[in-house]
C-alpha cells in the first residue's frame, strides 16, 4: 500500500455531534485538521498528488515550491479554496473497489475546515470527497500502522507521531496538570492555557489570541458585515450559528441537560462549565498564590490581579480596564442600551445574565446550597463567598499590614486604605469614593431617588440605614415575630439573627481563643480585640479607629455636620444614637426613680442615668460621715 488518505487521519463529526460543539471546540478542530492537511500537502518537494492526469505540486501551487519551503508558505501564499478545489476537481479514484467505502456524497468536514477561514471564499460543498495520495519518494521506507493497515512515511527519519485517534492512546502529556492528548498540536495549544501565551495579535484593536482561528474569527467583528439579524430585537450577527444561540435568549430553549442534577442550559459552553461543579476539577493553578481554578478564562482573569495590567482602554473617556467584560460593560454606559426588561417590575438590564439573576428575586429561586449549613443563595459569587467562611481560607494577604482576605474584591478595597485611592468619581460634583456602592448611594443625593419607603407613614429614604433608623420610631410596626418566644422585629434579618439565640448555632469560631459567633461580622469585630488593629485613621487629627463606620462619625466633629435633627425642638446631632437618646426627653416616660432622698422625687429615662445619680448621692453620704 503506497498512499495516505485524508480521511484516514482526519476526525469527523456527524451533524448532530457538530451542533453540540461550541466555537472554541470548533476552532480547535479546524486548527488540528488544517495542520494535518498541511502536513499531507507539503511533506516534501518530491511528494505529488497521485490521480488521473498526475496533479503535481506545480499544478496546485502555480509554481515550483523550493525544497526549503516551510508549511507556512502553503497557508500564506495560496488560497485554501483554490488549492483544495483543484485537488478535489482533478482527483479521480484509481481503485474504486478499494475506496468505495470512503466515498461520501457530501464532505461536511471540509466545510467545517473553511467555515471560519476568510480565505475560503468558494463554496466547496459540491466537492464529493477528499482523497490525497502521496507518492513515496525513492529511498523512503514504509511504516505500516499494524492496527488498521495505514501506511505512513517520513523521509530519512522514523515515524515519530503515529495516528492515535482510533486506539485512544494519548502519548502527549501536559507536565503542569497531567492532561494527556493524542496529538502534539493539541498539547501545544493546551500548554498556552497555563503559560498564558497568546501569540496572535489583532492589528485593529490589539487583542491577543492563542490560536489563529480565534484571531480570524475575531477579525470578522471589525471587518465582516453582520447579515444575520434577530427579528425580535433587531440585533445583528456575523454568522448564523451566533444568531441561533442568541434566539435561545428569547425562546428560553435549553437543549443541554446535566445528567447529574437535571439542570438544563441554553449553551454548550455553560453546560460544560456546570459539569465541572460536580467533578470539582481545578487544573489551572496560580504560581503566585497557589489558588486553583476550574476554567482557563477564570485563571487568566486572576493572573491580571497580580500584574495589574489594564489593556482595554475606552476611547470615549480614556478609562482603562483589566478585563474585556468590564470594558464592554463600561462602553454601554456611554450608549445607555438596556435591552432586557423584567415583566414583573419593569427594571431593565444591560446583560441577559443580570436579567436572569434578577428574576430569581421574584421567583425566590436559590439554586446554590451550602452543604455544611444548608444555607441557600441566589448568586454563585455569594455562595462561594459564604463557603470561605467555613474553611477560613484567606489567600489574599496585604504586604503592608499582613491582613488576609477571602476575596480579591475585599483585598483590593483594603489596599485603597493604604494608597488613598478613590477611583469612583461623581461626574456631577467631583466627589470620589473607594467603593462603587458608595458612589451609587451618593448619586441619590443628586437624583433625589428614595427607594426605601416606610409602610407605616409613607416617608421615603435614599439609604437603607436611614430607613431602618426611621422604622424604629414606629414601635408597633414589628411584623416579623419569633414563633418560639413571641419577640417581634422590624426586619427579617433581625429575626434571623435572633433565631440563632434559640438554636445556639454559632458557625464562626475564633482561632485564637475558641469563642464562637453566629455571624461573620461579629467574628471580624472580635478578632480585632486580639490584634488591636485600627486601620482607619483621621487625616485631620491622627486619631485611629477599629471600625469603618466610626471614622465618618468622628469626621463630623471637624466638619461640624449634624445630619440628625429632632422634629420636636429642632436640635441637631452628629450621630443617630445621640438623637435617639434626645428623643426620649420628648416622648418616653421616665421609668427609673431614685430611692435615696426624702422624698425620692428624681426620675430618669434610663438605668445608666439612675446609676450615675445614685453614685453622686453615695459620695455625698460618705463625705458627710467621714469629713476631711
UniProtKB/Swiss-Prot annotation:
InterPro entries: C2H2-ZF_domain, KRAB, KRAB_dom_sf, Znf_C2H2_sf, Znf_C2H2_type. Gene3D superfamilies: 6.10.140.140, Classic Zinc Finger. GO terms for molecular function: DNA-binding transcription factor activity, RNA polymerase II-specific; RNA polymerase II transcription regulatory region sequence-specific DNA binding; zinc ion binding. A zinc finger (C2H2-type) spans 172-194, 200-222, 228-250, 256-278, 284-306, 312-334, 340-362, 368-390, 396-418, 424-446, 452-474, 480-502, 508-530, 536-558, 564-586. SMART domains: KRAB, ZnF_C2H2. One of its GO terms (cellular component) is nucleus. Residues 4-77 form the KRAB domain. Pfam families: KRAB, zf-C2H2, zf-C2H2_4. Its main location: nucleus. It is found in: Nucleus. May be involved in transcriptional regulation. Belongs to the krueppel C2H2-type zinc-finger protein family. This is Zinc finger protein 555. It comes from Homo sapiens.
Amino acid at each position: 500500500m503506497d498512499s495516505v488518505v485524508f480521511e484516514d487521519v482526519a476526525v469527523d463529526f456527524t451533524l448532530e455531534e457538530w451542533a453540540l460543539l461550541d466555537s472554541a471546540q470548533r476552532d480547535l478542530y479546524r486548527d488540528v485538521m488544517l495542520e494535518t492537511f498541511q502536513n499531507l500537502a507539503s511533506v516534501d518537494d518530491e511528494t505529488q498528488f497521485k490521480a488521473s492526469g498526475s496533479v503535481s505540486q506545480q499544478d496546485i501551487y502555480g509554481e515550483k515550491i523550493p525544497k526549503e519551503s516551510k508549511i507556512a508558505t502553503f497557508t500564506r501564499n495560496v488560497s485554501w479554496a483554490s488549492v483544495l478545489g483543484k485537488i478535489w476537481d482533478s482527483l479521480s479514484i484509481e481503485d474504486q473497489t478499494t475506496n468505495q467505502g470512503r466515498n461520501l456524497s457530501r464532505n461536511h468536514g471540509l466545510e467545517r475546515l473553511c467555515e471560519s477561514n476568510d480565505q475560503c471564499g468558494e463554496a466547496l460543498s459540491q466537492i464529493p470527497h477528499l482523497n490525497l495520495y502521496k507518492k513515496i519518494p525513492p529511498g523512503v521506507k514504509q511504516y505500516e500502522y499494524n492496527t488498521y493497515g495505514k501506511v505512513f512515511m517520513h523521509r530519512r527519519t522514523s515515524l515519530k507521531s503515529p495516528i492515535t485517534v482510533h486506539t485512544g492512546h494519548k502519548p502527549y502529556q501536559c507536565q503542569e496538570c497531567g492532561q494527556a492528548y493524542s496529538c502534539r498540536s493539541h498539547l501545544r495549544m493546551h500548554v498556552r492555557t497555563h503559560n498564558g501565551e497568546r501569540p496572535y495579535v489583532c492589528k485593529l484593536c490589539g487583542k491577543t489570541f492563542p490560536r489563529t482561528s480565534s484571531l480570524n474569527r475575531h477579525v470578522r467583528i471589525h471587518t465582516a458585515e453582520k447579515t444575520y439579524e434577530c427579528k425580535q430585537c433587531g440585533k445583528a450577527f456575523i454568522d448564523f450559528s451566533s444568531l441561533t444561540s442568541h434566539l435561545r435568549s428569547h425562546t428560553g430553549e435549553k437543549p443541554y441537560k446535566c445528567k447529574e442534577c437535571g439542570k438544563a442550559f441554553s449553551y454548550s459552553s455553560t453546560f460544560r462549565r456546570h459539569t465541572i461543579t460536580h467533578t470539582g476539577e481545578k487544573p489551572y493553578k496560580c504560581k503566585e498564590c497557589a489558588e486553583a481554578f476550574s476554567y482557563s478564562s477564570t485563571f487568566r482573569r486572576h493572573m491580571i490581579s497580580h500584574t495589574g495590567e489594564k489593556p482595554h482602554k475606552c476611547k470615549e473617556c480614556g478609562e482603562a480596564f483589566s478585563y474585556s467584560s468590564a470594558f464592554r460593560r463600561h462602553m454601554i454606559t456611554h450608549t445607555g442600551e438596556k435591552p432586557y426588561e423584567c415583566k414583573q417590575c419593569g427594571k431593565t438590564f444591560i446583560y441577559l445574565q443580570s436579567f436572569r439573576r434578577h428574576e430569581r428575586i421574584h421567583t425566590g429561586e436559590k439554586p446554590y446550597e451550602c452543604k455544611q449549613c444548608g444555607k441557600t443563595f441566589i448568586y454563585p459569587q455569594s455562595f462561594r463567598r459564604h463557603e470561605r467562611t467555613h474553611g477560613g481560607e484567606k489567600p489574599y494577604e496585604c504586604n503592608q499590614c499582613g491582613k488576609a482576605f477571602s476575596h480579591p474584591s475585599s483585598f483590593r478595597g483594603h489596599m485603597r486604605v493604604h494608597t488613598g485611592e478613590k477611583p469612583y468619581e461623581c461626574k456631577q460634583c467631583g466627589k470620589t469614593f473607594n467603593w462603587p456602592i458608595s458612589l451609587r448611594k451618593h448619586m441619590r443625593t443628586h437624583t433625589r431617588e428614595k427607594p426605601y419607603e416606610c409602610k407605616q407613614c409613607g416617608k421615603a429614604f435614599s439609604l437603607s440605614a436611614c430607613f431602618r433608623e426611621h422604622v424604629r420610631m414606629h414601635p408597633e410596626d414589628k411584623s416579623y415575630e419569633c414563633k418560639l418566644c413571641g419577640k417581634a422585629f422590624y426586619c427579617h434579618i433581625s429575626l434571623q439573627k435572633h433565631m440563632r439565640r434559640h438554636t445556639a448555632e454559632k458557625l464562626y469560631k475564633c482561632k485564637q481563643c475558641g469563642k464562637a459567633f453566629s455571624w461573620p461580622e461579629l467574628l471580624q469585630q472580635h478578632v480585632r480585640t486580639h490584634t488591636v488593629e485600627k486601620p482607619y485613621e483621621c487625616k485631620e487629627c491622627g486619631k485611629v479607629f477599629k471600625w469603618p463606620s466610626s471614622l465618618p462619625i468622628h469626621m463630623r466633629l471637624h466638619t461640624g455636620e449634624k445630619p440628625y435633627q429632632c422634629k420636636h425642638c429642632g436640635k441637631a446631632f452628629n450621630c443617630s444614637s445621640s438623637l435617639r437618646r434626645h428623643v426620649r426627653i420628648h416622648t418616653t416616660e421616665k421609668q427609673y426613680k431614685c430611692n435615696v432622698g426624702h422624698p425620692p422625687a428624681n426620675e430618669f429615662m434610663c438605668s445608666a442615668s439612675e446609676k450615675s445619680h445614685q453614685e453622686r448621692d453615695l459620695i455625698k453620704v460618705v463625705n458627710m460621715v467621714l469629713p476631711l
